[in-house]
Structures are given as structure tokens and as C-alpha cells.
């Protein structure tokens, strides 16, 4: 029960971090990583408690999506910092021009 509270608090901290820190792109990426890692840990513990060891492929799929999201986010941040010399989210819409 305590582990469930820890995982839910990690999830809500990541969600609140995304909602409250919308100024810098790097802080949004870090909060999104916290959100997705807590989701991964929750799914892994749920699969362990159900006694079905065949669901580990879904855990690897979620972890792969987290890694892809991180690489795409970091590449967007590098492009943003090279073109506009800042990592502010308000400059992100200017990348399309």
C-alpha cells in the first residue's frame, strides 16, 4: 500500500510539475520523464503482483517509448537553443518558420 502511495505521488508530482512549470522546456521534459517512469514502475509492479511473467514485453515497450520521447524532446531543445538561444517554451512555435 505504501508503494502505491509513492508511485501515485511521483505521478502527481510529475503532472503538477508539467502544469506549473510551463516556462522552460527542460523542466517540462524532466517532469514528463518523472511521469512516465512512475507509470513504468507502476506497470512493472502490477505485472509482478498479478503473477503473469509474460507481460514483460509491455514493460519494455513502455520503456522504449520513454526513451524515444526523451530523444525527441532533447533534439527539439537543441534545435530551439541553436536557433533562438533560449529554451523557453514560447519560442517553440517559431521553429516551424
Curated annotation (Swiss-Prot):
It catalyses: a ubiquinone + NADH + 5 H(+)(in) = a ubiquinol + NAD(+) + 4 H(+)(out). One of its GO terms (biological process) is ATP synthesis coupled electron transport. It is found in: Mitochondrion membrane. GO terms for molecular function: NADH dehydrogenase (ubiquinone) activity. One of its GO terms (cellular component) is mitochondrial membrane. It is a multi-pass membrane protein. Gene3D superfamilies: 1.10.287.3510. Its main location: mitochondrion. Its EC number is 7.1.1.2. It is an enzyme of class 7 (translocase). It holds the Pfam family Oxidored_q2. The chain crosses the membrane at residues 1-21, 25-45, 60-80. InterPro entries: NADH_UbQ_OxRdtase_chain4L/K (IPR001133), NUOK/Mnh_C1-like (IPR039428). Keywords: Electron transport, Membrane, Mitochondrion, NAD, Respiratory chain, Translocase, Transmembrane, Transmembrane helix, Transport, Ubiquinone. PANTHER family: NADH-UBIQUINONE OXIDOREDUCTASE CHAIN 4L, NADH-UBIQUINONE OXIDOREDUCTASE SUBUNIT ND4L. Core subunit of the mitochondrial membrane respiratory chain NADH dehydrogenase (Complex I) that is believed to belong to the minimal assembly required for catalysis. Complex I functions in the transfer of electrons from NADH to the respiratory chain. The immediate electron acceptor for the enzyme is believed to be ubiquinone. Belongs to the complex I subunit 4L family. This is NADH-ubiquinone oxidoreductase chain 4L. The lineage of its organism: Eukaryota, Metazoa, Echinodermata, Eleutherozoa, Echinozoa. The gene is ND4L.
